[in-house]
Amino acid sequence: MSNIDPKARTWAEIDMAALKHNFEIAKRTGKKVLCVIKANAYGHGAVHCGLFLEKQGADFFAVACLSEAIELREGGITKPILILGYTPEKYAEMLAKYDITQAVQDERTALEFGRYAAEAGVNLNVHVKIDTGMSRTGIFAQGEEAALAAADTIERIYNIPGITVKGMFTHFSVADTPSEDEYTAWQFKNYTTVLNALTAKGLRPEVCHASNSAAILAHPEAHLDMVREGIILYG
């Protein structure tokens, strides 16, 4: 017989009062609040935290991948869920089945999602990501000319059967660095150039968002319709 205690030797105790306090920082902006609970809510327990935050008034959740989104739905989360990362386009029907919103990074991906969704007889909600200066993923929109071209691309995405554009977002790369505020302002200008061009076409997305945790605290001008509260939820 082994004398080893099978119970875990370590555990984490989550202070839900602290989580509520941190959530309310974003809520005080007066905007919709998207809570980022990817990677098991940064190790804090995605379903447990998600259910709690939903009761506190969270409007939206974001995760990294399809399996994380399904875990939330099956755990009882009812608010909209946005997948920030890549999902193979063939899973369009599953995304629609679980009422999950998918981020799309380019026109080709949007076309493929639309094709699979139309073949399955479903409609998929998407948020279009634009690259205003992070230089990672999204439709290129750095500078006025590129931003106007991005608006034309998004106009074409609006017309793809099988998908509905519900939102548009970007990610600030250095919003947490005061010495780089000029760059964050440039990114936001690129975003608003795209947004204004779409609005002129009669295509303003329902939910526009750009502010990550740092921008919630430091850049109120960029709060738009919704803010994305990530790491500041947890510490």
Regions found by a protein language model. Give the residues of each.
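Active-site-proximal beta-alpha core segment in soluble small-molecule metabolic enzymes
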Residues: 3-6, 10-13, 18-21, 31-209, ...
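Histidine/acidic residue-rich metal-binding segments in metalloenzymes
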Residues: 24
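Active-site loop ensemble at the mouth of alpha/beta enzyme cores that anchors a bound cofactor
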Residues: 217-235
